[in-house]
Amino acid sequence: MRLKKMSKLFITDTILRDAHQSQAATRMRTEEMLPACEILDSMGYWSLECWGGATFDSCLRFLNEDPWERLRKLKKALPHTRLQMLFRGQNILGYKHYADDVVEQFCRKAIENGIDVIRIFDALNDIRNLESAIKFTKKYGGHCEPALSYTISPVHNEDYFVKLAKELVQMGADSICIKDMANLLLPMPAYNLVKRLKAEINVPIHLHTHNTTGTGDMTLLMAAFAGVDIVDTALSPLGNGTSQPATESLVATLKGTEYDTGLDLEKLSEAAKHFRTVADRLKRDGFLDPKVLSVDTNTLIYQVPGGMLSNLISQLKQANAEDKYYDVLAEVPRVRKDFGYPPLVTPTSQIVGSQAVLNVLAGERYKMFTKESKAVLRGEYGRLPGKVNEAVRKKAIGNDKVITCRPADLLKPELDTYRKELGDLAQSEEDVLSYALFPQVAKKFFEARRDGIVPSGADKTVSPAPASRLRALRPCTASRRARLLSRRALRASGVLAGLPPLLPFCFLLCSAAAASQSSSSAV
């Protein structure tokens, strides 16, 4: 699918995906989306982002929904609008690398079930991790939008991103996304980067940012002046703060100018009324904390994405160590430097953040490592952008050999194994893919479906427990460590929304907290 020549600023609305992922732990239900689809479909958006990211995990883990059924229902309800998803390259929607046969089948099934645009990113900007997803998206007729995971470091500058964009165009990109997940792209750098990209590559430029630091609106405006083709916004009930800038505000700002989006403010207001009731429900249930709507300039200082901030707070609450919050924020950029300056986006944001928490709570840097930190330093996630602190790497992995090839080249085909493991629980190839990404969670879902608890094809949801009903976390003791490891405790806390499955990490947090209480070591 090729784009028509751009003549105005086009809008992708994230209300059905990143808006509630960024603000409300990805807890919007399908039944809350469908009533608004008729008006959304008439809006004239370039696309609606509605799938991928953490929505897949959240559907199965928390909402008792089949994510594939959600996609099919949305496609039926939005016949005139492109549906867009976020795809983590070789990680697909999970937190590890998958073999190419799994990547191909997922691209194929996503497009068959209704996805039009696949935005593909790699946390390390390692293009080797994007090759297969790009190839298979194009093979099955999808619009391929590789993303530049934007960040700031001694190795990430304008020339770096222009070079990366050119390589992605050569690989077959239909458009290029500047993915500013941490709201670090300030207005003037945005203007300059978009200007360069428009001058040096010949595909549309799509800008994704957030409003965590309060600069998102200005960044979008300057990008529009520089000639950006498409921008991401979110309807106001779930816009701004850690989400995207509000759609209505940008539409009103540009109305009557050469950048006029063509969207109708009255229609947007009508759609917003519906999502205001959804936002109210998310607040009542404790998933939408008003804090995520405020401006937080710590992102500019510590380069920590908004969603990562909320995850750090959750982890520190688990360890009864909220007073260490600013110590952890200061430790994050130090860990990032030691790890070779990875951009802080899933899964590296969680990995770096978790290691920073461990370093602070243990009272000693790198006294313990998560297995994911070891994997990053071993090269299992791909090529790190900058120079790694070799002393830290040696402490983490000893004499293990560092992977220098494309990590997926070391993986054998996996689909047949997943099919055999799931057996009769699988009703479709889509079920096999769900199991491949989240085996324990998906299997539990399929068993419930088989037993009639989740009717096949239904999108009935389980209402999450309001925050007021959640038991307060108490200081970690030996007896509580085991309970923290239990699935029930993790699910009730909501900490796993959008996080990689770091079950052993909860135990490490408790151990580190205990060590910190008895240690006099300075951090």
Where do the PLM segments sit?
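N-terminal amphipathic alpha-helix/helix-capping segment at the start of soluble metabolic enzymes
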Residues: 2-24, 71
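Hydrophobic faces of well-ordered beta-strands that scaffold small-molecule active sites
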Residues: 11-16, 48-50, 81-88, 118-119, ...
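Conserved, mostly hydrophobic/aromatic
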Residues: 19, 120, 176, 227, ...
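Terminal or standalone catalytic/regulatory effector modules within metabolic enzymes
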Residues: 41-59, 289, 293-299, 303-483, ...
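Active-site beta->alpha loop and helix N-cap motifs at the rims of alpha/beta catalytic domains
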Residues: 52-144, 148-164, 186
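Catalytic cores of alpha/beta
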Residues: 160-164, 214-226
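Glycine-rich phosphate-binding active-site loops on the catalytic face of alpha/beta enzymes
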Residues: 180, 226-243
